[in-house]
Curated annotation (Swiss-Prot):
Residues 60-64 are annotated as: G2. It comes from the Bacteria. SUPFAM superfamilies: EF-Tu/eEF-1alpha/eIF2-gamma C-terminal domain, P-loop containing nucleoside triphosphate hydrolases, Translation proteins. This is Elongation factor Tu. It comes from Alkalilimnicola ehrlichii (strain ATCC BAA-1101 / DSM 17681 / MLHE-1). It is found in: Cytoplasm. Mg(2+) binds at residue 26. It is an enzyme of class 3 (hydrolase). Its EC number is 3.6.5.3.
Length: 396
């Protein structure tokens, strides 16, 4: 049974484990693959297969991440687990592994610890929408009241960061016992319960093709007798010939009509998320559009210059800066297809930022960019990447 192929008919959801070091994230990840493979098919993965995560590069940053997949009665899940704390920070900020929901692992024996708090804060900052809690190592706690106390602490911590602490599912168990095949309540049944909680509590994400149309503009051409063509890869949604679109960013927003969509030199009726297309724009002059703007469904996204963000600053070993930067630092911010200069305002009490740190800051750009919460960007100095960030809150 366990070798059966995944049924791709089930909806697909991306999740990941977060939480303090040694609270059992990787053990839980392994237990989930084993118990769910037995119950619903799929491949079991051993702890050491997950723990020796390969390094991958995302936006020039090296991140160690393990990817596993499993299914439940309702869904197919892709699950990421990172070996080290720094990998989590980088992963969440770069969006290398986008999460529709997270499983927060807290050791019942220790309660919430500094990284528990930090990961919840990061989840809030980078826009992880839902968190489900697994209170692990319950076999090491004899006192029922202590378990309740830890659960209360975790719920309060979630509420502190604007997650609905009171409504969050909290499953108590022991990932190790489950992995060992224990059938008592805290063993395998706790994993099934966790899977059910994920199915119920984490909504199925909207597919990119169902979202409002957006295409970052990479190039602009003028075709004599036909007009102006902009090219790029459709990020989300669908564009049909004859539809009205907006050009947003860098200049005043303009409305125009898409009079043709072409792909591989063929004219099409429409282009959709994932397609590399050329869009012919009615009445738009070659010099009114440029790389760095976006083509989008009217009213779906607006241009902004000032925002709060969470930034990971590359270490020297990663090819980043060798020295710290201070308040008023002015690098370039690379959004989608272009660099815009901006100045950085550090939080009160933060004198400087060292390579390898992550920091919350406020940025003011010299030109507006089509922006929404959760938008990823790179921080660059003269074309060299020195950081990665995500917009956490738009100010103006």
């Amino acid at each position: 049974m366990s070798k059966s192929k995944f049924e791709r008919k089930k909806p697909h959801v991306n999740v990941g484990t977060i939480g303090h070091v040694d609270h059992g994230k990787t053990t839980l990840t392994a237990a989930m693959t084993v118990v769910l493979a037995e119950a619903f098919g799929g491949d079991a993965r051993a702890f050491d297969q997950i723990d020796n995560a390969p390094e991958e590069k995302a936006r020039g940053i090296t991140i160690a991440t393990a990817h596993v997949e499993y299914e439940t009665s309702e869904r197919h899940y892709a699950h990421v687990d990172c070996p080290g704390h720094a990998d989590y920070v980088k992963n969440m900020i770069t969006g290398a592994a986008q999460m529709d929901g997270a499983i927060l692992v807290v050791s019942a024996a220790d309660g919430p610890m500094p990284q528990t708090r930090e990961h919840i804060l990061l989840a809030r900052q980078v826009g992880v929408p839902y968190i489900v809690v697994y209170l692990n190592k319950a076999d090491m706690v004899d006192d029922e009241e202590l378990l309740e106390l830890v659960e209360m602490e975790v719920r309060e911590l979630l509420s502190d960061y604007d997650f609905p602490g009171d409504d969050t599912p909290v499953i108590t168990g022991s990932a190790l016992k489950a992995l060992e095949g224990d059938d008592s309540e805290i063993g395998k049944p706790s994993i099934i319960k966790l899977a059910e909680a994920m199915d119920e509590y984490i909504p199925t994400p909207e597919r990119p093709v169902d979202q409002p149309f957006l295409m970052p503009i990479e190039d602009v051409f003028s075709i004599s007798g036909r007009g102006t063509v902009v090219t790029g890869r459709v990020e989300r949604g669908v564009i049909k010939t004859g539809e009205e679109v907006e050009i947003v960013g860098l200049k005043e927003t303009q409305k125009t009509t898409c009079t043709g969509v072409e792909m591989f030199r063929k004219m099409l009726d429409q282009g959709e998320a994932g397609d590399n297309i050329g869009a012919l724009l009615r009445g738009t002059k070659r010099d009114e559009v440029e790389r760095g703007q976006v083509l989008c469904k009217p009213g779906s996204i607006t241009p902004h210059t000032k925002f709060e963000c969470e930034v990971y600053v590359l270490s020297k070993d990663e090819g980043g800066r060798h020295t710290p930067f201070f308040n008023g630092y002015r690098p370039q911010f690379y959004f989608r297809t272009t660099d815009v200069t901006g100045s950085c305002e550090l939080p009160e009490g933060v004198e400087m930022v060292m390579p390898g740190d992550n920091v919350k800051m406020t940025v003011s750009l010299i030109a507006p960019i089509a922006m929404e919460d959760g938008l990823r960007f790179a921080v660059r100095e003269g074309g060299r990447t020195v950081g990665a960030g995500v917009v956490s809150k738009i100010i103006e």
